Amino acid sequence: MQFHKYDVVIVGAGGAGMRAAIESGQRARTAVLTKLYPTRSHTGAAQGGMCAALANVEEDNWEWHTFDTIKGGDYLVDQDAAEIMAKEAIDAVLDLEKMGLPFNRTPEGKIDQRRFGGHTRDHGKAAVRRACYAADRTGHMILQTLYQNCVKHGTEFFNEFYVLDVNLTPDENGNPVATGVVAYELATGELHVFHAKAIVFASGGAGKIFKTTSNAHTLTGDGLGIIFRKGLPLEDMEFFQFHPTGLAGLGILISEAVRGEGGILRNVDGERFMERYAPTIKDLAPRDIVARSMVQEVLQGRGCGPNKDYVVLDVTHIPEETLNAKLPDIMEFSRTYLGVDPVTEPVPVFPTCHYVMGGIPTNIHGEALRDNENVIPGLYAAGEVACVSVHGSNRLGTNSLLDINVFGRRAGIAAAEYALGHDFVEMPENPTTVVEDQLSLLLSEHGNERVADIRTELQATMDSHASVYRTEETLKQALTDVQALKDRYQRITVADKGKRYNTDLLEAVELGFLLELAEVLVVGALARKESRGGHAREDYPNRDDTNFMRHTMAYKEGEGLRSEIRLDYKPVTFTRYEPMERKY
């Protein structure tokens, strides 16, 4: 076991983690722990753009952006946070430009902008060009740019260090204070304790709960699971976004930028069906609306292909030079994975799990909450692992790359300033006990269940029973299945007993997180008897502001996987926009 001491420890090296590290590292001694090499983080898979009301191409302002974010989130957005994000978006983009990010340019040399779903001018009157982009590799460019700047500032990275626990020390009133993390070094199997004044979780989402997902194999909700197991709340975990355009049968992302450049969704009759569902902005309606519309087309017999189980994305009317210049990766993905050339034929697409709107509840400074009001001193979160909540029940495209930059920066500054103003708090007497017990149990010979089998069954039941459309019946079936899988998880066997690069062991750990988070999702979805944003109940098809204009707060009660989930609720913050009917 090795001990380390830093002012600030950041867990995760994607966009939010590295943006926080740039700010924190210039103010306090900072370490970044990541289970992946930083430039392999999932931020690199984001394609379409990062929005800001620069008004380089069309008239725009941050207030319209705020309104679109709130309406897009079906009014479950904390409006103070949305205002901050929209206001600070402009500087966030310009900061990246100064760091060297190669944005596409207008003929005049300004940052170019394109249309994206749900982004409008003058409170919904027409689509607006707000997304700043670097071809269809915007996330990749952001990741590379942030990493270069971390290296420039001398950020200390601990690569392939898998954080498995956060240490919390009670203060004089018995309330938790963050004091460190415990990490497993993949190369050696050794445990490392990082004593810190401030900890920032930026560990990403949990899309691998589902089979059909745009998420990488590594997005297993580790940070969410660690926090949940400490008895701390997770907010709005029933709200998962299903991106409308995943490659059919695979889930690989086809960016919304394709529709922003003029791509059209069509059914088996060749009809542009989104004209029926969203007459004003059609294919550029928010993602939850487009995804549900696509599923409805299939359910009503208008799907394409031999099994009529997908729709198509048509770009054959767009010049080939435009496609190659602005959407090169999308062209390659379609040809490589489906054998379809978008220049000459439409691309088969269907919704794919993409993003979790919920997460660790935080305030606008990135400080993590232990209940509806009180923060945990020294604990911060940013990015997809966090819930500010700027996305409400449905995130708008391009707001995620914005979120990681705005709130990653804020969390990094706040964590460093907290660390500079406080002394180290003593860690628990045996900081590695929880992790040692967890790993020992997984490595012991106590069963014959395989991790891969349980994970496959979990993902299949979540795809079938808790995805785009849900009912009481399907959710109860999902809950029964997940709880049965949790019982089987107690009897798993890990074949590799070695210490070096034991990925079998870590996949077993990840599966434990996925099982718990799947249950949190289903329990929250069962309790929310309405349809809002990414949560669509066929048995409760309408939004119910009277009973459910509130954030779900899920707490773990008891120890181990057989513990109960307690739900509480937190009010939504309103500043200027009252809820109204959501039409596009």
Show the residue positions of the predicted features.
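Conserved redox-cofactor binding core of oxidoreductases
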Residues: 97-190, 195, 202, 243-250, ...
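Short beta-strand to alpha-helix junction loop
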Residues: 77-90, 129-148, 158, 213-221, ...
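Glycine-rich loop(s) and the adjacent beta-strand/alpha-helix scaffold that form part
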Residues: 198-252, 397-414
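Extreme N-terminal leader/targeting segments of oxidoreductases
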Residues: 1-8, 26-27, 175-176, 186
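Glycine-rich active-site loop/strand segments that organize a redox cofactor
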Residues: 52-85
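N-terminal Rossmann-like FAD-binding beta1-loop-alpha1 element of flavoenzymes
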Residues: 8-32
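An anion/pyrophosphate-binding glycine-rich loop and adjacent beta-alpha core
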Residues: 226, 232-348, 414-420, 455, ...
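Glycine- and aromatic-enriched mobile tails/lids
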Residues: 1-6, 15, 23, 37-39, ...
